[in-house]
Amino acid sequence: MKSPLIIFTLKCFIIIYFAACTGIGEGTAYKSATPQVTKGVWKVNLLNAAGKELAGELAGYTLTFLPSGKIIAVRNGELIRGNWSEDEILKRITINLETKDPYLTKLNDRWNISSVNAKDVTLQNTENSSGSRLQITSL
């Protein structure tokens, strides 16, 4: 009778030990960007592509992320539509604006989510060699 109880206790101890030592549960909290970006209007605060800062070229554009997956960019009354989505498993946002504007098309990509808060969302593209960075700021 004592042997199964000792084995069970030993197994529980080992599981708890490995869980504590390996940090299971640490760093797994993921904050989705969707609840933040769908709360209003945003502007591009930082766009670094191929080592060049391009946010100035996008000055005046506002971005609205709709919960339906649509995105609208507006500057001087001109509306540019597109689609966006968030993949919570891969922790990334995909943006696809229907435009030929060479600077606005730089937003069309799959962006890894670096950080999310009420005022800023910081994204990074690690799929290409340039390591582009994008930060949008709430207006």
What is the predicted function of each stretch?
Residues 1-21:
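Sec-dependent bacterial lipoprotein signal peptides
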